[in-house]
A protein has these predicted regions:
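Active-site beta->alpha N-cap acidic-glycine motif
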Residues: 29-155, 240, 258
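Catalytic domains of cell-wall/extracellular-matrix polysaccharide-remodeling enzymes
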Residues: 85-92, 112-265, 271
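Bacterial N-terminal signal peptides that target proteins for export
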Residues: 2-14
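C-terminal domain-boundary segment and adjacent tail
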Residues: 32, 72-75, 180, 234, ...
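Signal peptide processing junction and immediate N-terminal pro/mature segment
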Residues: 24-28
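Bacterial N-terminal signal peptides
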Residues: 11-23
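Acidic/histidine-rich helix-loop elements
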Residues: 44-58, 121-124, 195-200, 206, ...
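Short, basic, helix/turn surface patches
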Residues: 101-109, 135-140, 203-222, 290-310, ...
Length: 325
């Protein structure tokens, strides 16, 4: 097993070296990079599902599905099945989740309870992964699809290398491929403040949040592109992390416009994972999760510089909401 892993790593580095050489030639001729990105959306049916009525959840999902179809953007949604179980609303919530597969989008597992591998331990986490499969597998099978992808809650992949390797082996044994993240603009934090503003009818704050979110996302893409080039010499097929919330439901098309202005085409997660960067050695372990560009940089002993500073005023508003009774 270890020999095969070593051979794969050497092969990946050789092919990456070829990609770097080609990319260098493109840079010298002034050619634009072939930018592609896969969209992944976490915390289905909704990040704030417990505080959201079935009617609001259904409306949000309908808007997001319509925007994805209109923009012709493929996506994979990662499910926390615990959020389906609210007294008197289970059927409606499952129906809202089924809209994803009925619209032709794939679902992945995000654990049942959004458990962090770093916090609950391996056995409890494994049980939560299994518990999070039941409804999702049924919905996918009804549309001749398989449950193929797993996304780590909080991007926590293990506090130590042994735990990480055991968790990885467990996921492979259940037929999963881990969905990495290379671009993350913290839409979950924007989304929480946005939903609060929407409930209170504060249209001015909603608009301010949207503009800040779109601007910050643009900065994060620029940072990820540059870090990629510093790390491997070219811009790989990126994977963007989003969350199921009303911010995305209401403004996804505007986000798409920002991304397209940077020259991106939207691709499937499967196509993105075909980029050889996702075969690079990755021994990242820590108390806190992070994106995979950081994984690879730290694995190579080159911790990255800090990314764009997240707007402090959004953080302060999010804290104030959490303190509100």
């Amino acid at each position: 097993m270890e020999v095969r892993r070593t051979v794969r790593r050497i092969w990946a580095w050789c092919v990456l070296a070829s990609a770097i050489f080609i990319s260098s030639g493109m840079a010298q001729t002034g050619a634009q990079p072939d930018r592609r990105v896969a969209i992944t959306i976490d915390d289905l049916p909704a990040g704030n599902a417990s505080g959201m009525s079935a009617a609001t959840l259904t409306e949000m999902t309908s808007k997001l599905m319509a925007a994805l179809r209109e923009q012709k953007v493929p996506a994979v949604g990662f499910v926390n099945e615990k959020k389906l179980y609210k007294i008197g609303e289970v059927d409606a919530r499952i129906k809202a989740l089924s809209m994803w597969v009925e619209s032709g989008f794939e679902l992945g597992n995000h654990t049942y309870s959004h458990f962090s591998l770093n916090k609950v331990g391996l056995k409890a986490w494994e049980d939560d992964v299994i518990q999070g499969e039941s409804v999702t597998r049924i919905l996918l099978s009804q549309h001749n699809m398989q449950l193929r992808y797993f996304r780590h809650p909080y991007l926590d992949t293990g506090r130590d290398l042994e735990t990480r390797r055991q968790a990885d082996a467990f996921l492979v044994g259940r037929g999963y491929r881990i969905a990495p993240v290379t671009v993350d603009a913290w839409d979950w934090m924007y989304g929480g403040v946005y939903e609060d503003a929407k409930k209170r009818g504060d249209a001015a704050l909603q608009q301010k949040l949207v503009q800040s979110y779109l601007s910050y996302t643009d900065e994060v893409f620029a940072y990820s592109e540059q870090l990629s080039k510093e790390l491997v010499g070219y811009e790989p097929k990126q994977i963007l992390l989003l969350h199921a919330n009303e911010l995305e439901g209401d403004h996804f098309s505007e986000l798409v416009e920002v991304i397209r202005k940077r020259g991106y085409r939207f691709i499937t997660l499967e196509e993105a994972l075909g980029d050889l960067i996702y075969s690079l050695p990755d021994t990242y372990v820590a108390e806190e999760g992070t994106g995979w560009l950081d994984h690879w940089a730290i694995t190579r002993g080159k911790p990255p510089r800090g990314g764009p500073e997240f707007p402090g005023w959004v953080i302060e508003r999010a804290k104030a909401i959490r303190k509100t009774p």
